[in-house]
């Protein structure tokens, strides 16, 4: 997959996704990442990329022309069509379902804003999607772009050594429940012991325990996801047991309502 990132701080992107799984994906040619700086396409001695907003107000707004020239260079570098995705708190929210859809694209271009934002005319004329990573404001789009690169790249075939690892992640299963707890050696520790069922060798019991824990975690932390999950009859029996032993209190109801807003 090829991802082009347009940013005034390309080094930020390089550093953010240069390690671990995503770094190895680049080394192995599974992710073809290119960074572009609009300042390189700005005119004049000062290579200005921003100006004051019409109508007054605080801050600066990114200019159309450096962005337009930069985007032309990005598109000329590879004839393969690609959507331009602008990282913005006003965009649609990135979730695992949307990450899977983006991962199916052969190429995408991510645009990072700075200052007060980008001239609206450029957005209206060139941007195909505005994408948000959450309901909060950051100093720029670079962190959001790094999140998108990570979320999308790890879904590419061959990136993870164990494909089952991705399938079992929170939000990744077909029912979108949280992942179950994980343990490793030693089995006994001052912080606690590994649950006996995981050491029993009884794979049926282990599978049931993991499913129960997945349901329990989702019920306790994000009960709103339970309503969206596709649960089997056995799941619903487990969930009924969980609800009896872990009734939802008022605070968690309010929290679930707030998260779903």
From Swiss-Prot:
InterPro entries: Alpha/beta_knot_MTases, tRNA_m1G_MeTrfase_C_sf, tRNA_m1G_MeTrfase_TrmD, tRNA_m1G_MTases_N, tRNA_MeTrfase_TRMD/TRM10. Pfam families: tRNA_m1G_MT. S-adenosyl-L-methionine binds at residues 113, 133-138. Coiled coil: none annotated. It comes from the Bacteria. Keywords: Cytoplasm, Methyltransferase, S-adenosyl-L-methionine, Transferase, tRNA processing. It is an enzyme of class 2 (transferase). The keyword RNA-binding does not apply. Gene3D superfamilies: 3.40.1280.10, tRNA(m1g37)methyltransferase, domain 2. It is found in: Cytoplasm. One of its GO terms (biological process) is tRNA N1-guanine methylation. GO terms for cellular component: cytosol. CDD domains: TrmD-like. The keyword Lipid metabolism does not apply. Its main location: cytoplasm. Its EC number is 2.1.1.228. One of its GO terms (molecular function) is tRNA (guanine(37)-N1)-methyltransferase activity. It catalyses: guanosine(37) in tRNA + S-adenosyl-L-methionine = N(1)-methylguanosine(37) in tRNA + S-adenosyl-L-homocysteine + H(+). Homodimer. Specifically methylates guanosine-37 in various tRNAs. Belongs to the RNA methyltransferase TrmD family. This is tRNA (guanine-N(1)-)-methyltransferase. It comes from Xylella fastidiosa (strain Temecula1 / ATCC 700964). The gene is trmD.
């Amino acid at each position: 997959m090829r991802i082009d990132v347009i940013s005034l701080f390309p080094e930020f992107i390089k550093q953010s996704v240069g390690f671990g799984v995503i770094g190895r994906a680049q080394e192995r040619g599974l992710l073809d990442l290119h960074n572009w700086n609009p300042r390189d396409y700005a005119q004049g001695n000062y290579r200005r990329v921003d100006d004051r907003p019409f109508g007054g107000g605080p801050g600066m707004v990114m200019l159309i022309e450096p962005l337009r020239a930069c985007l032309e260079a990005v598109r000329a570098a590879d004839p393969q069509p690609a959507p331009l995705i602008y990282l913005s708190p006003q965009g649609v929210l990135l979730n695992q379902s949307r990450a899977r859809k983006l991962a199916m694209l052969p190429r995408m271009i991510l645009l990072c804003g700075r200052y007060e934002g980008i001239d609206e005319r450029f957005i209206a004329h060139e941007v195909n999607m505005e994408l948000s990573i959450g309901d909060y404001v950051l100093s720029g789009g670079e962190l959001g772009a790094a999140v998108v690169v990570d979320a999308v790249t790890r879904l590419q075939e061959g990136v993870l050594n164990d494909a089952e690892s991705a399938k079992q992640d929170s939000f990744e299963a077909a029912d979108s429940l949280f992942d179950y707890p994980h343990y490793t050696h030693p089995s006994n520790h001052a912080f606690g012991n590994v649950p006996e069922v995981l050491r029993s060798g009884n794979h049926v019991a282990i599978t049931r325990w993991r499913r129960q824990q997945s349901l329990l975690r989702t019920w306790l932390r994000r009960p709103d996801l339970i309503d969206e999950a596709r649960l089997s009859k056995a799941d619903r029996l487990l969930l009924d047991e969980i609800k009896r032993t872990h009734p939802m209190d008022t605070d968690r109801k309010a929290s679930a309502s707030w998260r779903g807003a």
